């Protein structure tokens, strides 16, 4: 079956009639980075007070660990604003870190023992304690090392004018159904061809040997001092060594419709795990995990892309989707780009604009479990050996087998058309330039981020030395930066407000933690 069909051109023509559509994409970035100390080791200090409450600051929080910062931009419709806001957040954060720096890549710096990794703390409220307990569960299930691998998440949505162009006037119910159906079509095409993202932008071909710490691996690593690497790898972060989850391989969550997806997710959070039950849930009065199901909560589901809707207060992600349908998608396959202080570049954003729009406008057949397994196989090949020229990928269980290069050129033939239309809407040639640059990378794997980073690591003698050198340079750049979109006053105001909000949440608690958890998980009964 030929998966790149001509319907794309017809749909593109419809949308292109209103050029404003291409100026109204909604975008947001979430960037994770480890705080580290002078000697290139993970910071053991608590979240800096000058950053406010990690629980309630809308721009600066923490992920798994107390030392794992997460920066969240507001949604914007302009790429310069998006990246400028990310710059501002980095600048303010660095001013509050003293001598500490931000680790500039996905794979962590040197970690002597897992005990050095303190779980993120959010205060004394029930909801804060639940967040930390969820992390305790992750630690016991998968180990802390896997959880401190950093990534970049890219949130993306189409404007209403996009749907108007494709479907004309619709009732609210029809529009909700149309959007959900189209976003799931996008998600299926992302599974089919999204391996382009780790091919181009994967930036974790190597890791510190301390990261393995007794874990077995069948991957044929080569050693450079204390650094282990795979010569043709693009993203170890997305490999079985990184943030994937074998316990979840029993789950069969489909992407053919919102109903199928929600049904699969609902089943997953109710499926008991014999393996996790052995860990115990509450032993000697102390909680070890939220529950012993395959997923403690929905967020534990590993996925390279997620359908999303902003949840109302107290609403679970699936409840928000069931209520209002898909509002935007979250791309979760980006490694931290080590060649920029903020972890993502304008070229990457432009490629994601093009690729996600193409994935939404292209034909997207339903996928069965066999086909899903096929896509996973392609992704696994690309993350472990994607720079092996001529690597063969099979699109679809019974589909064609072609080289990565042949598939990529097929996709780019249509991305180029889209880039021209989007450039014409903006009155420049920026999308075409991004397209041309990346198309060269298809036949020149040495231009990809993973290849550039591996060369640098080999020149410097180790991943640690490379990270420290880049981190030092970015610290200076971040400190020298001048606010472009936020102001110091806005940043300080958010810090103060976050502390007030945390205190209010703590004072509003009316039940003990046991009761709170029982109430939260009542829906599982």
UniProtKB/Swiss-Prot annotation:
GO terms for biological process: glutathione biosynthetic process. One of its GO terms (molecular function) is glutamate-cysteine ligase activity. InterPro entries: Gln_synth/guanido_kin_cat_dom, Glu_cys_ligase, Glut_cys_ligase. Its EC number is 6.3.2.2. It catalyses: L-cysteine + L-glutamate + ATP = gamma-L-glutamyl-L-cysteine + ADP + phosphate + H(+). The keyword Ribonucleoprotein does not apply. Keywords: ATP-binding, Glutathione biosynthesis, Ligase, Nucleotide-binding. The keyword ATP-binding applies. GO terms for cellular component: cytosol. Pathway: Sulfur metabolism; glutathione biosynthesis; glutathione from L-cysteine and L-glutamate: step 1/2. Pfam families: Glu_cys_ligase. Belongs to the glutamate--cysteine ligase type 1 family. Type 1 subfamily. This is Glutamate--cysteine ligase. It comes from Vibrio vulnificus (strain YJ016). The gene is gshA.
């Amino acid at each position: 079956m030929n998966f790149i069909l001509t319907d794309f051109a017809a749909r593109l023509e419809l949308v292109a009639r209103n050029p404003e559509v291409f100026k109204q994409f909604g975008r947001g970035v979430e960037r994770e980075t480890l705080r580290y100390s002078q000697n290139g080791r993970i910071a053991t200090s608590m979240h800096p007070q000058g950053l406010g409450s990690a629980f309630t600051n809308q721009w600066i929080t923490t992920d798994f660990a107390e030392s794992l910062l997460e920066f969240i931009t507001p949604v914007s419709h302009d790429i310069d604003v998006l990246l400028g806001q990310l710059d501002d957040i980095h600048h303010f954060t660095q001013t509050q870190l003293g001598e500490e720096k931000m680790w500039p890549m996905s794979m962590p710096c040197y970690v002597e023992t897992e005990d050095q990794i303190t779980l993120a703390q959010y205060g004394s409220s029930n909801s804060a304690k639940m967040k930390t307990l969820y992390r305790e569960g992750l630690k016991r299930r998968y180990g802390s090392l896997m959880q401190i691998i950093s990534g970049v998440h890219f949130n993306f949505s189409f404007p209403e004018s996009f749907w108007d162009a494709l479907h004309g006037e619709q009732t609210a119910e029809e529009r909700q159904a149309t959007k959900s159906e189209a976003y799931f079509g996008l998600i299926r095409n992302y599974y089919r061809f999204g391996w382009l993202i780790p091919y181009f932008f994967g930036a974790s071909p190597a890791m510190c040997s301390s990261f393995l710490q007794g874990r077995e691996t069948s991957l044929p690593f080569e050693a450079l001092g204390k650094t282990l690497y795979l010569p043709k790898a693009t993203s170890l972060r997305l490999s079985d060594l990184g943030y994937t989850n074998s316990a979840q391989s029993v789950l069969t969550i489909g992407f053919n419709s919102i109903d199928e997806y929600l049904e699969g997710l609902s089943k997953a959070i109710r499926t008991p795990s014999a393996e996790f039950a052995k860990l115990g849930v509450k032993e000697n009065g102390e909680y070890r995990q939220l529950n012993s199901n395959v997923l403690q909560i929905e967020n534990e589901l590993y996925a390279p892309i997620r359908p999303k809707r902003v949840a109302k207060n107290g609403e679970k992600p699936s409840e928000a989707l069931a209520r209002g349908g898909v509002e935007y998608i979250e791309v979760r396959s980006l490694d931290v780009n080590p060649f920029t202080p903020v972890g993502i570049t304008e070229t990457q954003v432009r490629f994601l604009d093009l690729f996600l729009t193409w994935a939404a406008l292209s034909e997207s057949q339903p996928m069965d479990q066999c086909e899903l397994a096929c896509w996973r196989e392609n992704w696994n090949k690309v993350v472990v050996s994607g720079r092996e020229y001529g690597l063969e990928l099979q699109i679809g269980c019974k589909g064609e087998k072609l080289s990565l290069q042949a598939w990529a050129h097929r996709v780019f033939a249509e991305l180029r058309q889209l880039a021209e239309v989007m450039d014409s809407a903006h009155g420049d040639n920026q999308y075409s330039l991004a397209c041309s640059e990346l198309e060269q990378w298809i036949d020149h794997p040495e231009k990809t981020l993973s290849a550039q980073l591996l060369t640098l690591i080999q020149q410097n003698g180790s991943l640690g030395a490379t990270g420290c050198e880049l981190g030092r340079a970015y610290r200076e750049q971040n400190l020298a930066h001048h606010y472009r979109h936020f102001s110091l006053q806005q940043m300080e105001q958010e810090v103060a407000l976050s502390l007030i909000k945390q205190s209010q949440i703590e004072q509003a608690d009316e039940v003990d933690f046991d009761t709170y958890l029982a109430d939260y998980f009542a829906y599982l009964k």
